[in-house]
Amino acid sequence: HFRDKVRHSPDAIFHNADLYPPQYVRARSVTWMRTDDAVTEPRRLHQGGAGYALERYFVWAITETPLGKWRREYLIDPLLYWRRKVHWRNFEASYDAAELEPASRTRSTYVLQEYFVPVEKFDEFVPKLAEILQRFRVNALNVSVRHAQADPGAVMAWARGDTFAFVLYYKQRTRDNAKNRVAVWTRELIDAAVSVGGCYYLPYQPHATPEQFHAAYPRAKELFAIKRRLDPAFRFRNVLWDKYYAPNLS
C-alpha cells in the first residue's frame, strides 16, 4: 500500500499508520493529500491552552478499561475518520502535546520509544515487535508508523536507507520494579530492530547495553574520536556520553 499509493505520490503531504494493540495485526493508514477543495475546518492553527478533558479521558480509558483498546479500534477511530476532511497543513501540524498529558504522573506515566527498520523489513519486524509487547503485557496506547528518507551523511544516522519509524507510546507504572521490567523488554525490542538491520532512537531512556549501542550505531567510534579531539577534558557530557563514551576513557 505505501509503495503503490504513498511513497512516490507528489500530492502526499502527511502520512501515518497506526498499529492497533494488543494484537498488532491491523493498521489504520491515513494520508493527507494536496487538494484545491474548500477546507472543512476554517482554523489554520490549533490555539492550545485548552483543558483537553475529553482527549485525556479517552487516553485514560484506552489504557485502563477492559475494552478500551477495542473501543478505540472499532468505535472511536472509525467515527473520527468516517468523513472526508480538508485541513490547512499547519492545522494538522499544530496539535498541542498537552492533550496527552495525564492528570498526575505519581503512580503511572506515559513514555515514548522509537525503532527504525528498513522499509523492506516491515513484515519481518512487526511480528517480532508484537510478540515482545504481548509477552511482557506492555500497555501500549499506540504504535505509529512513519516514513523517513535515507540520511547518508550523519555519523549517527538512524535512517541509513529508506526507513519506517515505529513510534511506541505506552503507559507504565512508576515503581522501581516496573521501570526494571521496561528495561528488559526494551532491550529485546532493540535486539529485534538490530536483527533486521535497524536501530533505535538514542535520546530516550538509555536502556541499551554498550554492545547494543554499537550494534545499532556502528559508526559511534568515529564520533568518539571526534569527541576526544574536540573535548579532551570531557567537559560537555550527559547521560548518553557517561554510559557509552566515558568507560572508553580509562
Enumerate the language-model features and the residues they cover.
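Noncatalytic alpha-helical scaffold of FAD-dependent oxidoreductases
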Residues: 1-250
